[in-house]
């Protein structure tokens, strides 16, 4: 998949081929040094764009937005206590400030030592708390700093992974650009929720899995070459105990799971994919018993290289709870809980207490059916039927700088429609093309989408939200960038065809930019006239 704007600098044949833009770009990348510069300038450029869109006015609004009321306060208490502490209840007298108002006004140390039951593991909240330690708990920029930095890093990872996967700096840069300017990605980098943190670790694990695939391919080819040269058979392949990138994947997805349990879905999908990849790589290398070798020899070893690493990482994220005395359920057995008996009676009380806590978290999450006005059925996620409204403040003329009859400040977790819907089409197109062409790159991206989406179809009756899709959106924009590459074609295509493709892609990207500019006030809480706010609700269900 190449175009004139990729790293491919092969000679342009005589005749009317390519576009004039190709001619200019070929002259621009006329040296190896310039090609190397472009390889990093593209991803870094879109990362800089992402940083501007995420960091500028990050501290606005100076109030706890949506579920920041949980994660900001939990982040602050956990870095002090090692577990999430409770906060005072809201006063019955409406004339008195609420707990959130007191926190926003600078009363940040009013949490107590009493433990609070929580629904998610602690790692993401530790990272949030670290940002608050850097900038102060009363600084709303500090509340959101960690999620913003990791959101920016996710754009960079998306760009370099797509560049490596499709061997095209253009496609990688496009993938990073589409994520950089997308509204859901911007909002989840500017509002302190756990999902943006989860996404970073998931994409990190995805990149490690890609590196493992190439590392393993080289080792298998070298093994077969050595065996063949020595006149030995290649019936069974080698057992690869040292796979550093597979270990790194287990670590990254352990960190993802330590942020939100949905990280386990990615671990399961990525681990199975690694075995399937082993199987196909062994077949390609010429190993006779390629299937049995992958499943019977390598799969158990790959399991040991990933799952225990992820499990230890997850448990380690609870260190603050283990060393505390007052964490939730920390003294469950001592206060009447039933100690294990039989073959598990040797397990320390601290681990039994912790396991009971995990079972309570599981029960809470599985049984979460509380109605919410912005809950979104996973069956409708791909059509973006119910994006999440996270913040809205209305003002009248002359109030807080409002110059219209009526103004509003809104933060809505809605994707750029021209990115989201095009990405959905691209995912379907890549699925069809994979069936027809069996390109492993397509399967790799589709696996990332499937890992993030399909498990949620088991919970269509749960209270879940559209913004959960951020965890697999990087893979959707990779699919979209790959589809754009297919539309562009090759630099040696006939000039009329190539020129039309470049123009159409340019028009599409221009529409994406204009749409992002139009939606930006709705992603960042800018004060705008109410009529402008209302114009963004293209579907009744978006309001």
Stretch-by-stretch model annotation:
Residues 145-166, 204, 429:
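Transmembrane-helix motifs of polytopic, lipid-linked glycan transferases
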Residues 64-65, 147, 164, 187-197, ...:
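Short acidic/glycine- and proline-prone juxtamembrane loop motifs at membrane-interface regions
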Residues 21-24, 28, 166, 205-245, ...:
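Membrane-interface transmembrane helices that cradle and orient dolichyl/undecaprenyl
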Residues 40, 45-46, 141, 158-181, ...:
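Transmembrane-helix signature of polytopic, membrane-embedded enzymes
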Residues 3-4, 237-248, 253, 278-282, ...:
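Transmembrane helical bundles and short interhelical boundary loops of multi-pass, membrane-embedded
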Residues 1-53, 297-310, 495, 499-505:
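Start-transfer (signal-anchor) and selected internal transmembrane alpha helices
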Residues 58-104, 297, 301-302, 310-386, ...:
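Aromatic-rich transmembrane-lumenal/periplasmic boundary elements in polytopic membrane proteins
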Residues 50, 175-180, 187, 253, ...:
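Short helix- or helix-capping micro-motifs
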